[in-house]
Amino acid sequence: MMLYRIVMRRYLASTWTGYGAETYGGRWNHKGHAAIYLASSVSLAMLETLVHIQDSSTLSEFELFQIEIEDSNIMLLQPQDWPTNWRSDPAPATTMDIGTEWLESESSLGLLVPSTLVPTENNLLLNPRHKSFQTCLSSVQPLSFAFDPRLK
């Protein structure tokens, strides 16, 4: 599966560490647990980035990466396992509990979860502590990218 990640240039050094999610937490992980959030398409990666941008003058400061994760290394979070409040804002503890438990189990390299912005599309949590993590990094490629300046 091809996946995508958009990163602000000043954070390029930590792109594949899980530092941001570990420091601040995320929808599918508690603080203190490293995770790397990826999107299943470039357009979804853009939406997932734009929803967090507070200053549109920073739109020119991002880079796009593509990574390939073998389907056999991905676990799908089944819809029947989604908490009823999974789309709540701020993110509920129920979703953080699910992702954190998965991270700690190291049962797969990736966990496919629904996007709250586009529920019919998926994001993937990548576990930087999984035994296959370093191997998958060899597939990372930077892609040419720029947000359209009309986006604000």
Curated annotation (Swiss-Prot):
InterPro entries from the UniProt entry: RES_dom
Molecular function per GO: nucleotidyltransferase activity
EC number: 2.4.2.-
Entry keyword set: NAD, Nucleotidyltransferase, Toxin-antitoxin system, Transferase
Membrane-spanning intervals of the chain: none
Pfam families, A to Z: RES
Enzyme class, first EC level, given as a word: transferase
SMART domains in alphabetical order: RES (SM00953)
Function: Toxic component of a type II toxin-antitoxin (TA) system. Expression in E.coli inhibits cell growth; bacteriostasis is neutralized by expression of cognate antitoxin Xre. Probably depletes intracellular NAD(+).
Assembly and oligomerization: Homodimer. Forms a complex with cognate antitoxin Xre.
Family indicated by similarity: Belongs to the MbcT/ParT/Res family.
Protein name: Toxin Res
Gene name, Swiss-Prot/TrEMBL: res
